[in-house]
Amino acid sequence: MPLQDFLFTSESVTEGHPDKMADQISDAVLDAVLRQDPKGRVACETLLKTGYVMIAGEITTKARIDYPKLARETVRRIGYTSGDMGFDANTCAVLVAVDQQSPDIGQGVDTGGAGDQGMMFGYACDETPELMPAPIQYAHAVTKQLAKARRAGLDFLRPDGKSQVSVEYRDGRPVRIDTVVVSTQHAESVSNKRLHEAVREQVIAKALPKRLLDRKTRILINPTGRFVIGGPMGDTGVTGRKIIVDTYGGMGRHGGGAFSGKDPSKVDRSAAYMGRYIAKNVVAAGLASRCEVQVAYAIGVAEPVSVMVDTFGTAKVPEGKIARAVREVFGLTPRAIIEGLDLLRPVYEKTAAYGHFGRTEKTFTWERTDKKDALADAAGLSKIRAVASV
């Protein structure tokens, strides 16, 4: 029996967290390549530490990329523009170690095969309007509001920050927020009282639904006391270190592959996006209230070696019918995924902070629910509804 009454916790980090800085630089490189060369192959990793950025990877493209300029522009947009913050876009060194993609990989990918082996997961549930788990969606809401408040005038806030939200479930449904943790980098000069008041009033109160907050909700702000040293000075940043933040906050499973810095021929990214697209349409169609999809690939082979659908006992029709409907409605080869979701556009830098899923921007094509009717028909749900209405 699944747990019915429990607490579930998810975390998010701001765009100024060093690992997210690395993700955004890697995806800025990918976008720069796709603008000039949609057929370019990109596997870009970034590392940041005090005073420098290192960009490394395998990139095969006709595009001409100014890597140092791109890195500095990204860091500047994030907000690190002074040595007082521990990192300065204007003075940081940028090291570049980029080679071409191995021809051994290229011979399989160029003919439409998967760029690597592996399994990828997609997940959706009906806990929020975005069909995302409540804990991760609320954690992202806090970090987004933290960045918004910083840019709106709370000049003692710095770009680095994290949130953590614990949601109480009863009978399997989210009913209240039990604990909120916010850790934000700040200027040395600000008092704890001023900081705590600002975060409570300008961040938490604006980010989270009032109906889920009560007198018993614990609010913890910078629990260690102070957070002056942050960003790459406080922690080394590396691409691909926040894969649970990027996805479902631990509520859905993860195949292990990171997203940022990878062009869509890499199924680590594109098939995970397709998994989300499928799961979201299953839930939107009313076929289930929770859905997880697993797809798996072999390198150089176009069709997935397996497709699995798990609805955790919430399906309105047999899961086998849903799985067959998925294969009927969705193209699952890398080429079909890329074409179906229009993934050769330079849209990836925006995905690299505040989650790849549960977003409302139109560029996030994998968040559409335009296949729900076709899926319901293919799974036989429309016939069941028609009979029930007679």
From Swiss-Prot:
Show the InterPro entries listed in the entry: ADOMET_SYNTHASE_CS, S-AdoMet_synt_C, S-AdoMet_synt_central, S-AdoMet_synt_N, S-AdoMet_synthetase, S-AdoMet_synthetase_sfam
Q: Which GO terms describe its molecular function?
A: ATP binding; magnesium ion binding; methionine adenosyltransferase activity
- What residues bind ATP, as annotated? H17, D160, G161, K162, R226, F227, D235, R241, K242, A258, K262
- What is the first-listed, main subcellular location in coarse terms? cytoplasm
Listed EC numbers? 2.5.1.6
Q: Where does K(+) bind?
A: E45
Flexible loop as annotated region, ranges = 101-111
Assembly, in brief, is: Homotetramer; dimer of dimers.
- PANTHER family recorded for this chain? S-ADENOSYLMETHIONINE SYNTHETASE
In this chain, Mg(2+) is annotated as bound at: D19
What's in the GO CC field? cytoplasm
What's the name of the protein? S-adenosylmethionine synthase
